[in-house]
Regions:
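Small-residue-rich transmembrane alpha-helical segments that form helix-helix packing/gating elements
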Residues: 1-32, 37-172
Length: 174
């Protein structure tokens, strides 16, 4: 029974991250009608930026986190401006090929830049896990889960309670 509870907790934590990624893909497809194959590479780019800021440049983890997110958003905006804006109205096959090309280009650029060897950053969290009865969770994973839940909640509020969200919903239904 303890193993089952541990697996359920692990699945919930991983599911929170996947849900956040899925919401991003859904928003991009719903608004822009683009299947963003490079979405995962933007996520990886943010992770590499965290490595750069924390391990190479020595920036504080909590300062580096929003900077890495901002750089990822800026790269996504640049991709939209350079690759997709000119293709508005193009059929889905064309935009899919463009995004597959972007995915391959980003993946290979990151591999050339970072050598394809797994990187890790120093954690600001305790190394001993949080123990809740018979289950345990690392503080890193708990942090990721809480941030994912907060961002999912913020996305829900934006989509359902703001003018921007109303415009987004109208675009989805168009």
């Amino acid at each position: 029974m303890d193993q089952l509870l541990q697996h359920i907790l692990n699945a919930l934590i991983l599911g929170g991250t996947y849900a956040l990624l899925g919401i991003g893909l859904t928003l991009i497809f719903g608004i822009m009608r683009v299947v963003n194959f490079a979405h995962g590479e933007l996520y990886a780019f943010g992770a590499y930026m965290m490595y750069l800021w924390v391990m190479v440049l020595g920036t504080n983890f909590y300062l580096a986190l929003p900077l890495a997110v901002l750089l990822g958003v800026m790269l996504g905006a640049l991709m939209e401006f350079v690759l997709l804006r000119k293709m508005r109205g193009a059929d889905i096959d064309t935009t899919m090929l463009i995004m597959i090309g972007a995915w391959i280009a980003l993946q290979n650029t990151q591999q050339l830049t970072w050598t394809g060897v797994a990187k890790s950053i120093d954690s600001p969290f305790p190394t001993s896990p949080l123990v809740l009865g018979s289950v345990s969770v690392s503080w890193n994973r708990l942090f990721v889960f809480i941030v994912a839940l907060a961002l999912i909640g913020a996305t829900y509020v934006i989509i359902n309670r703001t003018r921007l969200g109303k415009a987004m919903r109208a675009t989805f239904q168009d």
